[in-house]
Structures are given as C-alpha cells and as structure tokens.
Curated annotation (Swiss-Prot):
GO terms for biological process: cell division; mitotic sister chromatid segregation; spindle assembly. Residues 140-153 have a biased composition (Basic residues). GO terms for cellular component: chromosome; chromosome passenger complex; chromosome, centromeric region; cytoplasm; nucleus; spindle midzone. The keyword Lipoprotein does not apply. This is Borealin. It is found in: Nucleus; Chromosome, Centromere; Cytoplasm, Cytoskeleton, Spindle. It comes from Xenopus laevis (African clawed frog). Component of the CPC at least composed of survivin/birc5, incenp, cdca8/borealin and/or cdca9/dasra-A, and aurkb/aurora-B. Interacts with incenp (via N-terminus). Belongs to the borealin family. The gene is cdca8. Residues 140-187 are annotated as: Disordered.
C-alpha cells in the first residue's frame, strides 16, 4: 500500500502575511495623503495672501477717482482707459468750480435797518395814565420847598461828591487803559526787547553792487571770520546758495547739483574764460 501524502497549511499563512502587508500599506498611504493635503492647504492660503497683496498694490497704483468709483460704474464706463478719462474730466470740473469759488469776492450781508416799532393801542392807553401820575408827583414835590440851610448843605455835599468822582475819572493813565486790553492781546513781557536800528540801514533785501565789499553772517546774526581760500557762491533753486571752495571742486559730487546750479556754473566758466583772455 502506498503511503498517503500529508496536507500542508501554507495557504492560510500566505494569506495572513498578505493581509498584514496590505494593512500597513494602507496606513502609510493614508498618512502620506494627510501630509500632502495639509501642504496643499497651506500653499493655497499662501497663494491667496499673495493674490490679495498684489490686488491691493494694483489698486493703490490707480488714481483716487477710480478707487472711489463703484465697480458697476467702472464696468459701465468701459474699462480702465475710459474710466480714467471720465475721472479726469470730473477732476477738471471740480478744480474749475473750486477756483471760481475762491476767486469770487466775499460780500458782507447788509445791515438790517432797525425800524422804529409803532406803539400798540394798549401802550397808547397806558401813557396818559403815566403822564397824569407824574404831574401829580411833581406838583407835590413843588409844594414842599426846602429851606435855605438844607439847600446850602446839599450843594456842598454835591460839590464834594462830584470832586471825588472827577478825581477818580481824571486819573486815567495809559497803563490803566492798557490793562483792559490785556485780556484780548495778552500780557507784555517784563523786559521789552531793544532793537539796534543801526543794523537795518536798508529797507529791504538788495543785490550787492559791483566791487562792493560783502561780509557774511550766520543764521544767528553773528559775523563770520574772513577766509583766505578762494570760494564761489553758486545760486540754486528755492533761494539756496552753494559755496564751492577751490580745494573741494575736484571732489564735488555733481549728482547733488540741480539744473539751475549747472547753468550758473556754465555761465561762470564762460565769463572766466573771457576774463582770462583779457589778462593774457
């Protein structure tokens, strides 16, 4: 009799190993998917921020009239160029209106004349009663005449009172009158500044005459010492003057000079050339 073959259990073992490998692969795949999705979300947020910043920059580049415009009006006017033209026309109109308003002289309101108010019927009726009462009181006062002694005393008292009042009123000095104005103008300093009138010999600024000796002063007003070295004052824009020394001309930064200074330097060089030719 041939011996029977034993059955082996390899198939179930292989299946369990495959299942474990599949489960580990799925776990790794899920973790990788989560990492990639998080990175994509972060990149989307960064892209949105960049788009927002670029959008704001482009809006800032536009003129103010278009920025204040509604987007419906912007689209209705047909895009950027037409909207710019419309905004420019509106700006020109506004400037014309403001210029006309500023140029128009100010007209003061005419003072209303105060008309005399006519008395009413009630006041007319009350006035005769008042006049009657006044006449009665005057008659009573006239009936009682004061004696001569009382008259003299009253006259002396009135003279004394009037003298006191006139003395108080007559003592008004310029300093007393200025005290009333201090509330409006403010108090003057204790020590009044003294100005030397010999400094201001000319009424206004003037250009120095030909071959006139000129002395330089600082911003504080103190005179500056004379310089042995040769220098040139070159007028520039906004009333500024650039001083160029003979020793510093070679190391001068030309880019800092404006166009007016360039023109003045060229004119000076041409004049100096003529003068040097005459000296030869």
């Amino acid at each position: 009799m041939a011996s029977g073959k034993k059955k082996t259990s390899r198939k179930p073992k292989n299946r369990s190993v495959k299942n474990e490998k599949l489960a580990s692969f799925i776990k790794d795949f899920d973790s990788q998917v989560k990492i990639i999705t998080e990175e994509m979300k972060a990149s989307v947020v960064n892209i949105l921020k960049e788009v927002d910043s670029q959008y704001n920059i482009e809006i800032i580049k536009l003129p103010m009239a278009i920025r204040e415009m509604c987007w419906l009006d912007y689209i209705a006017k047909g895009g950027s160029q037409k909207a710019l033209e419309a905004a420019a026309t509106v700006k020109v109109d506004m400037e014309e209106i403001t210029s006309t308003v500023t140029k128009t002289p100010f007209k003061a309101d005419k003072k209303v004349k105060k008309g005399k108010c006519k008395p009413d019927d009630e006041t007319v009726e009350l006035n005769p009663l008042k006049s009657v009462i006044r006449t009665k009181t005057k008659a009573k006062v006239a009936a009682k005449k004061p004696s001569t002694a009382r008259r003299t005393r009253a006259s002396v008292g009135n003279v004394a009172n009037t003298s006191k009042r006139t003395s108080k009123r007559g003592r008004a000095t310029p300093s007393a009158s200025k005290q009333a104005e201090t509330s409006l103008l403010g108090y003057t300093p204790a020590a009044t500044p003294r100005i030397d009138t010999s400094i201001f010999k000319t009424p206004a600024l003037r250009t120095p005459c030909m071959q006139e000796p000129v002395y330089t002063f600082s911003a504080n007003g103190s005179p500056l010492a004379g310089m042995d070295e040769l220098f040139i004052n070159v007028p520039a824009r906004d009333g500024k003057i650039i001083r160029l020394l003979a020793s510093e001309v070679d190391g001068l930064d030309i880019n800092r000079l404006d166009q007016q200074a360039f023109e003045n330097i060229k004119l000076l060089s041409s004049r100096l050339e003529r003068l040097c030719k005459k000296l030869k």
